Structure formats: structure tokens, C-alpha cells
């Protein structure tokens, strides 16, 4: 890839240096110069619909849209002048022509970009004498409501639904001043209900059925946390409001966009927080008395459990006790649990719900440097191989990153799966192999042509298999992503294949901390760091006597 040279431009008398081809609006943002916009959104196609980003560029006959102009060396730009401010003021006046003045009851009030722009650039009075357009609010789905008069036709929602989510549930009907955002069905959305269209809307045209009329933004405390619904580890921000019963979670969003997920948040991260206050949630420990579980204090519960575990250990031995950990708890909690099991209870009978085989993955990578990739790497990797798993359902952020990479960088994506997964639409090459034959595919990639007999089908001919293998062998900087369908020797074979062509690897866990649970030693035969639970000395020197038999 040819190296991109830096160029220097002048913006409002200030020297700005950025790579050639950078959009002017981004070059300005990088040095703290604000250029307002509604329709522009990083990563989405350029629209130039709102005209709020108009700037004066020397030698240009008229004002230019900063969201579409790429910088060139020596360019001289003015972003603040009487001419520019008047143009922005006129745009605001046009947008407000039919926009209802219902800010006091609009859910976007206090977070509305149009409010902010009007405060900075808008006129105090309108010259329009005609009445505003009034239309009934529409409910497109359980979570998406549309208020047409509030819509400023920035098309962000249409683009993020189509380009970002690859759902294409929204479009534009009619033409010119009659244009209106509309769903892909007559009166309802047929989509994933991810809420990205609501999140990206700069005004209150799209609002959430889960949040409507519950509170005002300034009444909430915004608490950043990590979503626990899958292994992606997305940051989500919970809007928390004080109530008579304590603190209520009223909204989930991605307001600061500084987590690993950037702009993205799926339906689970955005809406699936009601379990926190569910009526069936245990809020106090229970102890069984006379055959019934009754509430008790934490002190009594801990004392009772400790006493019974000690009695069982002393009378029957540590091996009579089994400990089940969780792949949804933190590394610290998992580490302490397995240490408690081994050093206090004297048992290696500790495990968790295992799907992905991270132990085999660790063994296969032993001695290899820089062999693993991250989810963020999938945004820029030139080539990606996906074996098994359905990221759209199981790892939505990973799917979002792959789609973004294909759209912006034209990355090549090779997929082998037993199902017709949604990411197939982004695939350069796709093999639909029989279910449970992922290991045979890896053997074939390693040159075992006889394995092709177990893989061929109407959707994967022998020639297609060979072409798939040859295409992969020719890829540079390949990232191989595989799901829990591969285990043991199959993972070792995949690492052998990938290492031969300089690939990096990502092993996908099915739960929030599947990898951490394995790393921390929630395994019957391995200690933290995948050290054998038998015959080792280092941990015994630190922890004292440890059980030497493998757990169940």
C-alpha cells in the first residue's frame, strides 16, 4: 500500500497538517476547530444534505461543504465569518420551518443537536407566516417511534441501518420537499430492533419506546459499565435516576462512544438491563429451614456455608466437594474462587460452563509471538477468515467491525459455516459445509485432500474447496476467527495452517468472560495461566499444599 503523504492547510489562520485526502471536517476536528453538521457522521457515506458545514475555501466560487471536500496542500479555509454564519443561520431557519416547538416534552430535549445549533446560529424570530406541518406520530416497532415534523432529513438513520447494520429497514419515500423517512414495510419496521437509528438521530424524530417520557436527561446520572451479554465487552452507559425505592435504570445507550465498541451498541447492550430490578431477582441470601428456603442475613449465610463445607471436607475429603464457577464473573472473582477451592477445600473439582477450548488454544500458541489479534483489528485487517460461529447473533460488535472494514477498506472476508449466516453478504468467498465438519475443513486447509470427501455438498464442491484454500494461502496479514465448533487437535491444526502464512488468530468465547474463566484456572486440570494442576511446584511454594489429582 502506497504511503499517504501529509499536507498542510490553513484554517482560520491556523496551520493544520493531516494526511492527503482527509475530509476537511475531520481535519478541522482534529485540531479543535468545530464545523457544525447534522448529516455528516464518521464511517457513513457522505450525504451533504444539511448544508450546515458550509465554509469558505479560497479560490472557490461559492461556499463548500466541509463534509465532502478532501484537503489538498496549500488550501486556505475560513470556517467563521459573517458570510458563513449567515449561511448557517439560513439553514437553521429552513430546518425550523416545520419543526415543532415541543422541546419541553420531547425526549431529545437537552440532548438535541438542533437545539444546540439554534442557540449558536439560529435567529430569535422566524420570517415564516405559514402554519407548520402537523402529522401524527407513528409507532414502527415496540421500541421505535417516529415523529415526522421533527425529522430534518439528515438520513443518518437510513445510512446506519443499511450501511452499518446491513438491515436496510429504512428508506426515503417521495422526492424533494415531500421526502420522508419510512420503514421497509407499510407501517412497521422489520429489523433487529438494535436502536442504532434512535441513537444516531440528531433530533427527537426517532425515540425509544423503552425510554419515552420517563425522565429528562439532566435528571439522570450516567454510569459507564461493561455489557455482560456476550464476549465482545462493549461499553454501555446506564441512565440512572433516583426514585422512591432507590435508584432506577431508565436507559441504556452509548453516549460517550469511547469504549471498545466505538459508535456501536446492539439490542442487548441497549435494552437488556431490566433483569437488574426484576421481581424474581434474589436480593437476600436464603437458607433452608424445615424444608423451605427463607431469607437470612449475610453473616448467618456465610457462617452456615463455611461450617457445612468444613464438615464435609473433614469427614469425606476435599474430593467429595465440587465447585462451579461462572463465565460471567470477573477475573478477580474467578481467580479467588479457584484458589479457595484448591487451598481451603482441597479439591481440583472446579469447572465452569465451557464452550470454547481456550486451553488448547493457549497450548497451540505456546512460543509464538504476536500471534493473536483483537476485535478492533478486524476494522482494518485486509483479509479475514471466519470458521464457525454466527457473529451477528453471538458477537454483534465483531460483525459490525467486519462490515465496517468491508465497506470502508474493501477487506476480503472468507467464511466457512454450516449455516447461511448474515455475514455471507459481505463474503468474498463462502463455503457452507456440513454441520460438525469444521475440523475436517481445517485438515483440508493443511493439505489433506482426502478430507474434502466429508465437506463436499451442493454448496461446497470439490473445486470450490480447492479455490477457497488457494485464495487463503495468497492472503497477507490474514486474521483467522473461529468459534467454539473447533476444539483440541483441530485448533492446533488451524494454528499450524495460519502460522504458515503469517496469520493472527481470534478465538471466540460464547459468554461475557469465557476467556477469563479459563485464564484464571476455573478448570479441573489447569491452574491460572494454563499450568498443569498436577506435579507443579511454583504454585505450591506460594499457596502451600495443593491437591495433586486432576479434578472431575
Question: Model segments located where?
Answer:
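Conserved short loop/turn motifs at secondary-structure junctions
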Residues: 15, 38-43, 147-148, 180-189, ...
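Fe-S ferredoxin-like electron-transfer domains
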Residues: 51-228, 232-236, 241
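Catalytic alpha/large subunits of respiratory electron-transfer oxidoreductases
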Residues: 96, 100, 159, 214-552
Amino acid at each position: 500500500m502506497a504511503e499517504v503523504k501529509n499536507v498542510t492547510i490553513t484554517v482560520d489562520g491556523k496551520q493544520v497538517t493531516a494526511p492527503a485526502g482527509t475530509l476537511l471536517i475531520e481535519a478541522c476536528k482534529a485540531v479543535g476547530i468545530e464545523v457544525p453538521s447534522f448529516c455528516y457522521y464518521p464511517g457513513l457515506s457522505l450525504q451533504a444534505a444539511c448544508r450546515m458545514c458550509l465554509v469558505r475555501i479560497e479560490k472557490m466560487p461559492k461556499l463548500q461543504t466541509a463534509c465532502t471536500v478532501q484537503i489538498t496542500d496549500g488550501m486556505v479555509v475560513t470556517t467563521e465569518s459573517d458570510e458563513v454564519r449567515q449561511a448557517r443561520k439560513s439553514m437553521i431557519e429552513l430546518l425550523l420551518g416545520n419543526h415543532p416547538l415541543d422541546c419541553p416534552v420531547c425526549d431529545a430535549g437537552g440532548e438535541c443537536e438542533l437545539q444546540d445549533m439554534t442557540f449558536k446560529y439560529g435567529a430569535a424570530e422566524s420570517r415564516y407566516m405559514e402554519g407548520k406541518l402537523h402529522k401524527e406520530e407513528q409507532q414502527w416497532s415496540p421500541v421505535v417511534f417516529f415523529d415526522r415534523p421533527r425529522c430534518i432529513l439528515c438520513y443518518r438513520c437510513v445510512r446506519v441501518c443499511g450501511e452499518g447494520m446491513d438491515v436496510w429497514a429504512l428508506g426515503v419515500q417521495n422526492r424533494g420537499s415531500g421526502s420522508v423517512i419510512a420503514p421497509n414495510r407499510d407501517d412497521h419496521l422489520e429489523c433487529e430492533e438494535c436502536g442504532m437509528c434512535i441513537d444516531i438521530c440528531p433530533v427527537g424524530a426517532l425515540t425509544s419506546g423503552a425510554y419515552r417520557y420517563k425522565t429528562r436527561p439532566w435528571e439522570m446520572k450516567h454510569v459507564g459499565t461493561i455489557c455482560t451479554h456476550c464476549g465482545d465487552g462493549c461499553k454501555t452507559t446506564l441512565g440512572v435516576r433516583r426514585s422512591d425505592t432507590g435508584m432506577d435504570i431508565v436507559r441504556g445507550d452509548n453516549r460517550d462512544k469511547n469504549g471498545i465498541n466505538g459508535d456501536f451498541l446492539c439490542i442487548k447492550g441497549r435494552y437488556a438491563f431490566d433483569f437488574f430490578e426484576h421481581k424474581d431477582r434474589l436480593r437476600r441470601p436464603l437458607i433452608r429451614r424445615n424444608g423451605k428456603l427463607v431469607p437470612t442475613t449475610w453473616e448467618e449465610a456465610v457462617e452456615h456455608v463455611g461450617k457445612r463445607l468444613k464438615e464435609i471436607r473433614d469427614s469425606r475429603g476435599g474430593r467429595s466437594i465440587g465447585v462451579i464457577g461462572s463465565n460471567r464473573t470477573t477475573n478477580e472473582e474467578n481467580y479467588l474462587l479457584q484458589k479457595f477451592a484448591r487451598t481451603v477445600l482441597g479439591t481440583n473439582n472446579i469447572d465452569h460452563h465451557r464452550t470454547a477450548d481456550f486451553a488448547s488454544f493457549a497450548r497451540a500458541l505456546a512460543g509464538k509471538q504476536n500471534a493473536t489479534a483483537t476485535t478492533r483489528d478486524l476494522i482494518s485487517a485486509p483479509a479475514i477468515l471466519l470458521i464457525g460461529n454466527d457473529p451477528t447473533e453471538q458477537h454483534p460488535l465483531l460483525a459490525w467491525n467486519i462490515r465496517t472494514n468491508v465497506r470502508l477498506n474493501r477487506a476480503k472476508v472468507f467464511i466457512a459455516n454450516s449455516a447461511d449466516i448474515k455475514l455471507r453478504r459481505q463474503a468474498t468467498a463462502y463455503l457452507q459445509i456440513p454441520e460438525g465438519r469444521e475440523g475436517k475443513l481445517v485438515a483440508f486447509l493443511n493439505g489433506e485432500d482426502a478430507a474434502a470427501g466429508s465437506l463436499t455438498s451442493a454448496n461446497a464442491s470439490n473445486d470450490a474447496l480447492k479455490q477457497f484454500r488457494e485464495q487463503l494461502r495468497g492472503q497477507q496479514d490474514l486474521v483467522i476467527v473461529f468459534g467454539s465448533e473447533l476444539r483440541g487437535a483441530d485448533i492446533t491444526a488451524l494454528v499450524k495452517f495460519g502460522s504458515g502464512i503469517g496469520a493472527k488468530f481470534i478465538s471466540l468465547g460464547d459468554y461475557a468472560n469465557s476467556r477469563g474463566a479459563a485464564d484464571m484456572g476455573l478448570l479441573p486440570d489447569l491452574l491460572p495461566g494454563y499450568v498443569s494442576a498436577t506435579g507443579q511446584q511454583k504454585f505450591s511454594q506460594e499457596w502451600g499444599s495443593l491437591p495433586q489429582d486432576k479434578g472431575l
